[in-house]
Amino acid sequence: MTVAAHHLYLLAPGASPDDVRRFYRDALGLAEAQKPASLAHISVLWFSAGSIVFHVGHPAEGIVGDGHAALATDDLDAARARFIGMGYAVDDNVIPMGYPRFYVRDPWGNQFEILPEGLP
């Protein structure tokens, strides 16, 4: 089983899209990336820095959930089995996005999204 960085999901509670662009595009100099049409309904802007994509959530009503790092794997079932076998809780109860995925936290509370490789 292999894993690779996929994206980082960052939080911008209460920020407008213009506020988010002002920092990530204008100040940091990241390129705004187009998210897939299937995600158009989600209040998230995408920015790229080389091969890393930042997903920045900005709903005006606040954020539901936590920020996370996402890792893509060539064997989602093996990854899930490894975490469970090592005693880590796997959360499959996530908002449906049209592809299988799960979340897991490290012992210090940092959250990781584990998803199949090949997704935008």
Can you name each region flagged by the protein language model?
Residues 44, 53, 70, 101-102, ...:
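Short hydrophobic/aromatic beta-strand element in the GNAT-like acyltransferase core
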Residues 20, 79-82:
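Hydrophobic side chains in well-ordered alpha-helices
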Residues 9-52:
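Core segments of cupin and vicinal oxygen chelate
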Residues 38-43, 63-65, 96-100:
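Short acidic/glycine-enriched loop/turn segments that link adjacent beta-strands
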Residues 14, 74-77:
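Helix N-cap motif at beta-to-alpha junctions
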Residues 1-21, 67-69, 120:
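N-terminal beta-strand motif that seeds the catalytic metal site of vicinal oxygen chelate
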Residues 32-34, 55-56, 89-92:
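A short linear hydrophobic-aromatic micro-motif
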Residues 1-3, 86-120:
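Vicinal oxygen chelate
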